[in-house]
Amino acid sequence: RDMRRLILLTLYLLLGARLPLVGQGELIVMSYNVENLFDLEDHPERADDEFLPEGSHRWTKARYERKLHQIAEVLSSAGSLTHFPDLVALVEVENAGVLRDLLSHTPLGAQAGYAFTVTEGEDPRGINVALLYRTETFRLLGRRELSLHFPFDSAKRTRPILEVSGLVPSGDTLHLYVCHLPSRRGGARQSERYRRYACEQLRELTTRRLEGSAGHTHVLVLGDFNGAPEEPATREALGSRPYLESGGGTHPPRDTLHAELYELTPRRGEGAPPGTYCFRGVWTQLDQIHASRSLLGGGRLSYVEGSAEIFYRPFMGQPSVSSPFPVPFRTYGGAFWRGGYSDHYPLRIRLRYERP
């Protein structure tokens, strides 16, 4: 089984990204919390001691290289028959160095055509967010980091929001906001105000981007929200509503969509994970993708109905006594190395475009 997967992966890497472009196509967008992708170096200004060769997690070169290839395997598996995922939001990466290694130590760099941008935030552990993008289908226009400073807690330090803007093949402008909202440490209710504040900032940013746009400017907010989509931080502060898809692949009437942002709810059912994260048998949709209303109207760039899914392949999970569905195959359980991919499953959507 492993050899067959390796052969298919090699053929895909050699051929998949080289098919000709046509006037119509699709972009694959992913969001993936990769669980603590640290390098092997000690950064004294950050609390990264656990992830050093002599640290509590025994983070060795062999384990690091294995992790890089596992991430590459997931991304390669999530591509289509014609190309790799076009835009990949990565959560829990330490710095630009690990992304350079991801592209240079695995087949991704030679075949996928990725470039990247990553934050350099104030998180105490040095955790950041990043975006991989295929330069063939996303022309970078600009990027900036948006630091979160809480007026009610000036000492709190967390990950910034990454805003990336680019042109897609339709000629439309797509703004992506990659986020890793404050954790639930200290309790969900006690920490909720931090996530609410972050969502308020996101709402202000996205509203400003969409104001006065002529329908060819779009927004995606994606990443790890450290909370379910129905929680107040998302529903109230971000102002995002669940997108109820119509049957038959047709878009709901535009005048029925009143919010600016909609959560693209992943498909549920047999063979689909109940959530992206499982803790003691309880599944949660911590990872989310929210789209602007402009992507739901059937324009030159539009969301493909029914394409939102929790991306899962059997090699990414493992059996658990606490869940009837395989749970994510983690890299670590506490300080114990399990050798898996991540403690999250990624999300994947498709956007259809028409060239002008």
Predicted regions and their residues:
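Second-shell loop/turn segments in exported
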Residues: 53-64, 84-91, 118-119, 150-151, ...
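Structured beta-strand-rich core segments of catalytic domains in phosphoester-bond hydrolases
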Residues: 93-173, 177-181
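Bacterial N-terminal signal peptides
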Residues: 8-18
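Metal-dependent phosphoester-hydrolase catalytic domains
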Residues: 206-220, 227-356
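A long, amphipathic alpha-helix that forms part
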Residues: 192-214
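Catalytic metal-binding/acid-base residues of hydrolase active sites
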Residues: 35, 94, 182, 225-228, ...
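Active-site His/acidic residue clusters
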Residues: 45-48, 172, 177-191
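N-terminal, active-site-proximal structural segment of metallo-dependent hydrolase catalytic domains
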Residues: 21-111, 117-129, 200, 317-325, ...
